[in-house]
Amino acid sequence: METVSTQRETASSETERTREAASAETTDATFRSLEEGSTISSRYSETASTASEDAVCWLRRTAIVMRVYGLLTLETAFSVLISALVWLGYPSLGYECRDDPSPLLLSCTPVLVLGALELTDHRHPSNGLVFALYVALLSFTTAGLNLCATAPIGVSSLILTWTLFVACNGVAWEHRLSSVWRDALFTSTLLTVMVSVLASTYTWLHKTLLCLYTVFVGCILAVLFQDVRYIATKMPVSHIIRSSLVLYATETLIYHTTLLMLTPVVWSARWDQMFSYLAKLGTYHHYRVDNGTLSVILNSTTATFQSRVA
């Protein structure tokens, strides 16, 4: 009997131990699940907060970029308006750039503006006055350079400029395209254009000029690519006006180069007759002034003589 009771006590104690172990395991599992749930919830909250911060940053960057390209659109529209007013308002106004290529010096204006903007960087003022001065300077120099070309050449140059400008901006904004593929695309396009030019039936002078134009515009587009990437990723709010002016000056430089390339008169310009047309105008004006002064003197002398005779 004692043995049976002992066995029963042992069995009951083992059962209690088993129950305690099971309850302990259940409790541990519950705690582990709670900890995992809290970890998952914390991770989810961190992910949600990170996503919200990224969304806010993206919205801010988009607003900055929209302001830059909005100013660029305004600048371009003003330049087109000034050139159109000069062409349509004064259709007889022209300039013999073959005999006097001095207006071609206006094509250096975008280079000077880009140099002033790039070299001064953060020290350059960025306000409405600077914006208006640069836009007026580039717009009126573009209108002056257009006097060397006809309206169809100007429109063709503008279309080609916008095509190159938009294509470069599109490649710069394509984040999924790796830098290797971008460089390969740029290099292959440049080489294809140069090979096509060399294989054409143009004279060697024209081929040389076209190759130089291709290389020069390629360098401009490479710099433009870096400027667009800076605007898309790192540009602060205080540089909105400056960055729009950089894009505008680059666009103007491409247009000036393309306009000169498509104007055959420039290729045979007489560089030894620089400012000769202005000198002729000055001589003609001086001649008219002298003749007018002489006629006034003669008329007054004649009137005095007649009064004395009378």
Swiss-Prot record:
The gene is US14. Keywords: Host membrane, Membrane, Transmembrane, Transmembrane helix. This is Membrane protein US14. It comes from the Viruses. Belongs to the cytomegalovirus US12 family. It is a multi-pass membrane protein. The keyword Transmembrane applies. One of its GO terms (cellular component) is host cell membrane. Its main location: host cell. Residues 1-28 are annotated as: Disordered. The keyword Thylakoid does not apply. Residues 1-13 have a biased composition (Low complexity). The chain crosses the membrane at residues 68-88, 100-120, 125-145, 147-167, 185-205, 208-228, 246-266. It is found in: Host membrane.
